[in-house]
A protein has these predicted regions:
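Conserved N-terminal phosphate-binding loop of PLP-dependent enzymes in the Aspartate aminotransferase
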Residues: 1-222
C-alpha cells in the first residue's frame, strides 16, 4: 500500500514523535554518509508538524511557536504554495510552480547545510486547511533529488484517504524519503505512529559501530 521504495518502518506511539524520528534519522543518515554539516531543514510557511521541540521548530504558526522560539531550531522557511497566496489571474498550478522556483533558490544557496525538506502534502491542516496543487510535490521531489536533500512527507493528518487518494503523495506520483503517519493508522483506537523510509536510508545505519546506529527510544512508554 505504501508509495514505491518505502520498504522500512520505524514504529512509535504519538503523532509528533514520527516527525522527531524523521528529522533525527535524516540528519544521522547524512552524517553516516560523510555529510555531518547538514544541520538545517527547510519547512513551508504556515506549516504545522506537532508540538515537541523538533516538530515545533518546523512550524510557522505563532500561536504554537512564539513563546518557545528561544529553544527552537531555525529552519529555512520557503513560501507556501497554497491557494491563498495566488496572484490575480494566476492558476493554481502557476502559483505552485512560482513557489517551487523560490524553493529552488533556497536549495541552490543552502543545500550544503540542509538535511531535509519537510512538508504537509496538499493540505496545511492546522494552518487553516490551506490546499495546493500536486505539481508542487513533483517539483519538490525533483529538487530534493537534484540537491541531495531528503524529502519528509508529513501525512499524519492527510494520509489514509483524507485527500481522495490513499496517500496524498500519490496524487503527484512521487515517493518521499520519509513518510510520517499516525491518526488514520489505527482508526483512533490506539495511539501509534510510523515513519516509513527507503532501503538506502536503512542501510546507512548498518554498522558494527554503535554510534552509527539509530538509537532512538524511551525507557518506559506505551
Amino acid at each position: 500500500l505504501s508509495p514505491d521504495g518505502l520498504s522500512r518502518v520505524f514504529f512509535f506511539f504519538f503523532c509528533s514523535a514520527a516527525v522527531e524520528v524523521a528529522l533525527k534519522m535524516s540528519f544521522h543518515s547524512h552524517a553516516n554518509q560523510g555529510k555531518p554539516a547538514t544541520t538545517r531543514f527547510i519547512a513551508l510557511r504556515n506549516s504545522y508538524h506537532g508540538e515537541t521541540l523538533g516538530a515545533l521548530s518546523m512550524a510557522d504558526i505563532p500561536l504554537y511557536r512564539q513563546v518557545y522560539s528561544p529553544l527552537l531550531l531555525e529552519p529555512l522557511f520557503a513560501p507556501s504554495p497554497d491557494y491563498f497566496g495566488k496572484y490575480e489571474h494566476e492558476t493554481d498550478a502557476q502559483c505552485a510552480l512560482r513557489c517551487a522556483a523560490e524553493l529552488e533558490a533556497i536549495m541552490a544557496k543552502h543545500h550544503h547545510e540542509v538535511s531535509a525538506l519537510i512538508l504537509e502534502p496538499l493540505v496545511q491542516c492546522a494552518g487553516g486547511m490551506r490546499m495546493y496543487h500536486p505539481v508542487y510535490l513533483e517539483q519538490a521531489r525533483r529538487l530534493c533529488t537534484h540537491y541531495g536533500i531528503h524529502l519528509i512527507a508529513d501525512e499524519i493528518a492527510v494520509g489514509f484517504g483524507r485527500t481522495g487518494s490513499f496517500f496524498a503523495c500519490e496524487q503527484a506520483a512521487i515517493s518521499p524519503d520519509f513518510l510520517c503517519l499516525s491518526k488514520g493508522l489505527t482508526g483512533g483506537f490506539l495511539p501509534m505512529s510510523a515513519v516509513l523510509t527507503t532501503e538506502p536510508v536503512f542501510e546507512s545505519f548498518l554498522s558494527s559501530e554503535r554510534s552509527r546506529g539509530f538509537l532512538h527510544s524511551h525507557s518506559y512508554t506505551g
